Amino acid sequence: MIALRCAGFNNVQLETAKQHNIRVCRVPAYSPEAVAEHAVAMLLTLNRKTHKAYNRVREQNFTLTGLLGFNLHGKVVGVIGTGNIGKAFCRIMLGFGCQVLLTILLKLMI
């Protein structure tokens, strides 16, 4: 069995797996909330520069120069796409007190 920890399976040769009687399974969809929360975690890491602070502490450097972030409250956040993940991200950002601007992507049938 090949168990993929992702939604896509384009990196597996399905015909070859079938010929060798190997089952292929995948995650059909991730939790939109989990993905949105991870995006917020990355946003906070970049904003508060915790990745830089972590590296400095490991180097025994405890200076605060260049580590100042800013409050998200009152800031404008732009979100492209309002699928399940985009909606979950918007709800979290609204909870931070941000103004949220949305762009809805539409597929036009021409």
Predicted regions and their residues:
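An N-terminal-biased, well-structured beta-alpha scaffold segment characteristic
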Residues: 1-25
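Short, surface-exposed linear patches
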Residues: 6, 24-26, 46-48, 101-103
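Mobile beta-alpha loop/short-helix "lid" or hinge segments that flank ligand
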Residues: 11-16, 51-62, 97-99, 103-108
